[in-house]
Design a protein with these regions (language model features):
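Intrinsically disordered, low-complexity sequence elements enriched in Ser/Thr/Gly/Pro
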Residues: 3, 21, 37, 69, ...
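Residue-level recognition of short loop/turn positions
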Residues: 8, 64-65
């Protein structure tokens, strides 16, 4: 009976903690995007004491006259040393082309260093991160074209790491997931190269976060879980030049009439995320069009969970799916 009492007390305590956490989340979940303030908050992540231990090299790829910075993260010391050895062959190496999130408006490679370094370490693959141009200074499709130019250089062997195209995987979170999905559609349409695999982590695939949205998660999860529907609407308004942009499938991949001939796709969504349903719906459309697709919903997770520490259960669960997918296994 003592055990039952302590178990009941524990349940009450957990409920109180959950209610307190929910109140804090709700208080932090405000609408409106103040570009400068949001960028300043994002930039605080650069103060990372682990930075000096990351094995990385900076390069540039040109999009016309614009130099697109990229950063290569190495999975271990050996691969880092080999990068300086001109006789070393990287063709059999594997590589993730990473596109960061941030609503097309904030974030940078610097802010995502920990995530990229961890991605290289946890998968054993090279990671190449793209510093694409941000809105509102550079609106759609500037950032996407930067990502396309970098992908084209990698897939056509015009990059410092000459990796076989079939060994390259696109990966992005949130707005980065949107850019990866759009990049795959663009690659199919332009015919210059074609990604074999893509990993979309809680991607944005639609163009409306008002009450008109057809996706229930926008209403269910749009006010109390940090990323609000109001913020998402602000982000897409900052990213688009006009209303016409918002109807472009490269802006909102879910709107593409034809989603056939797309890469093998892994989609990870968060349970408490306004973007949950549109990410899963895009996956279902890809599957119906004959593509190989895996969709996994991370139970209990909020949008942005992938930035949590490597020991976090949601992150570990994600890497289980990611590594199985990269090895061609289904879970």
């Amino acid at each position: 009976s003592t055990l039952m009492r302590s178990s009941a007390a524990s349940d009450v305590y957990k409920r109180q903690i959950n209610q307190a956490a929910k109140r804090i989340l709700k208080a932090l979940s405000f609408d409106g995007v103040e570009v400068d303030a949001f960028r300043h908050m994002a930039d605080l992540k650069r103060l990372d004491p682990m930075k000096i231990f990351y094995k990385k090299i900076d390069e540039k790829i040109y999009n016309g006259s614009h130099a697109v910075p990229v950063r290569i993260f190495f999975p271990n010391e050996k691969s880092f040393q080999e990068s300086n050895d001109k006789t070393s062959d990287s063709r059999d190496k594997k590589l993730l082309l990473f596109v960061h999130g941030g609503g097309w408006v904030t974030e940078s490679i610097d802010n995502y260093e920990r995530i990229c370094a961890r991605l290289a370490d946890a998968t054993g693959q090279y990671v190449v991160a793209v510093e694409y141009r941000l809105a509102p200074e550079d609106k759609f499709p500037s950032g996407l074209e930067d990502c396309y130019v970098v992908a084209k250089a990698l897939y056509t062997g015009k990059f410092v790491l000459n990796v076989k195209p079939e060994n390259i995987t696109l990966i992005g979170d949130s707005a980065g997931g949107n850019l990866c999905a759009a990049l795959s559609l663009m690659a199919r349409d332009r015919g210059e190269f074609m990604p074999k695999r893509q990993i979309l982590i809680y991607p944005a695939t639609y163009n409306d976060y008002t009450e008109k949205s057809p996706f229930p998660s926008v209403k269910e999860n749009g006010t109390d879980y940090l990323l609000t529907a109001g913020k998402m609407q602000d982000y897409i308004d900052l990213y688009a030049k006009n209303e016409e942009d918002k109807q472009n499938p490269y802006f909102a991949p879910y709107l593409a009439k034809d989603v056939s001939h797309q890469p093998d796709t892994l989609i990870l969504t968060s349970e408490f995320d306004p973007l949950r349903d549109e990410g899963e719906a895009y996956g279902k459309r890809l599957k119906e069009a004959g593509n190989y697709v895996q969709i996994h919903r991370i139970k209990g997770a909020l949008h942005g969970y992938f930035a949590l520490g490597i020991k976090h259960l949601y992150v570990q669960e994600s890497f289980t799916y990611i590594n199985a997918f990269l090895k061609g296994e289904a879970l």
